[in-house]
Each structure stands twice: as structure tokens, then as C-alpha cells.
């Protein structure tokens, strides 16, 4: 017989382990853009409570987040270019159209995204 204590301090919950790079992405790699928000919505609808995203540090040898050169820095490839356009840090002209494979491609993303980042503009916040 399975007993369930409604007043138990800890209830059983579940989640998913999926690295950010494994999300679909328009620029060669998954990012914290629209697809990440859609994935969170999917997790909520399917009753999941947790999303473990693994290390977010710059990848090292073999594109592994576990062999990073820094445990404190973040991987810039996970920054979503479309979000930067939406928030006026980039203009749509700063992002050139390019075909990427359907799988995660660090090499292609690394040769593309940093070039787009060079167009970043200072953003003033008006209070």
C-alpha cells in the first residue's frame, strides 16, 4: 500500500536536464531567447518542476562545459541576438542571415555571434 502524507514536508517532484545549447536556435546554438521561454512553458504544462541547465560557463576543449577556462564567466554564445534587437542593443541590420545546421554547432556559432556582438550599442536607462 502506498501512503501519501498530505502534510509531508517534502513532496515528490520531477524535472528535466537539458543544456541551453541543446535548445533549437536560429544562430547555430540554443540561447536564452524565445525558445527557452517556450521550453519553460512546456515544462510547466507537462507538470515538471525543475530544469537543470548544467554549467553555463564558456565551453573548453571538445566544447565541454566541464572543461571551461573559467568557473565564473558565462558563455556569450547563449545570449540571444533577437532579444538584443528587441531591446535595441542591436539593430536588425546587425544580424546577417545565414544557414546553420539543425544540430548544435559551436564552431559555426562562434564564427557568427561575436561578429554580431561588435555592433552592440550602449543603452541608457531613463528613470
Where would I find each of the regions flagged by the language model?
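Short, acidic/polar
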Residues: 32-40
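Acidic, His- and aromatic-enriched active-site or binding-groove loops in soluble protein domains
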Residues: 68-90
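Conserved, mostly hydrophobic/aromatic
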Residues: 43, 53
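Single conserved hydrophobic/aromatic residue that forms the stacking wall/gate
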Residues: 119-127
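N-terminal regions that are enriched for targeting/export leaders
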Residues: 2-21
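Aromatic-lined carbohydrate-binding surfaces of glycoside hydrolases
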Residues: 55-75
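The substrate-binding groove and active-site-proximal loops of carbohydrate-active enzymes
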Residues: 21-31
